[in-house]
Amino acid sequence: MVFAAPIVAAFFYKPTKFNNYGDIYQPARPVANLQMQGANGPVELDSLRHQWVFLAVADGVCNADCEGNILKTRQLRFMQNNDMSRIRSVFIHTNLAPDLAADLAAKYTPVEVYAVEADAYKKWTEILEIPDAPTEAQYDRFYIIDPAGNLMMSYPPSADPNLMKKDIKRLLKASQI
């Protein structure tokens, strides 16, 4: 009886609070393929699989929160030290002026900058929505896509990079992909 008690307790225990800082998408959402245009020609989003993807997105304009997220994708990747090679930093946009996109790519190297057609972008970003969140909380977020191509976490623009780093360290340690 004493030996069975922990097993029975674990079966009925349902935690309501987790140790993560970001918003987890449960279940993880498969990310659809997306045709993108990079500086070196067309690229498919599926080609980014098999690595973690830190993602920032913008529709039309890249405001201060957008640029902050691009910077976070780069900085958080660098913060991972030896695990940096397991991560790609990506910025997907639509309707940005080509010279602005090129400036962002140069300013935030090695972040990969890709343009997407407006209709495809609008349909594709439906997956990014967070249920029951206010409208303003839906945009200008920092997203994490796992190596299997699933959207699994996001952070608001005001997120503390040090707390984000802890989440990411845990993810990378647990996945070993």
How does the language model describe each region?
Residues 8, 12-46, 67-68:
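N-terminal "domain-start" segment that seeds a small globular fold
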Residues 39, 50, 147:
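Short, ordered coil/turn segments that flank beta-strands lining enzyme active or ligand-binding pockets
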Residues 46-69, 73:
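Short active-site neighborhood of thiol/selenol oxidoreductases, capturing the structured segment around
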Residues 56, 89-91, 144:
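Structural beta-sheet core signal
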Residues 64, 68-109:
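Structural microenvironment flanking redox-active thiols in thiol-disulfide oxidoreductases
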Residues 101-139:
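Short, internal strand/loop/helix patches
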Residues 138-177:
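Thiol-/selenol-based redox modules, centered on thioredoxin-like
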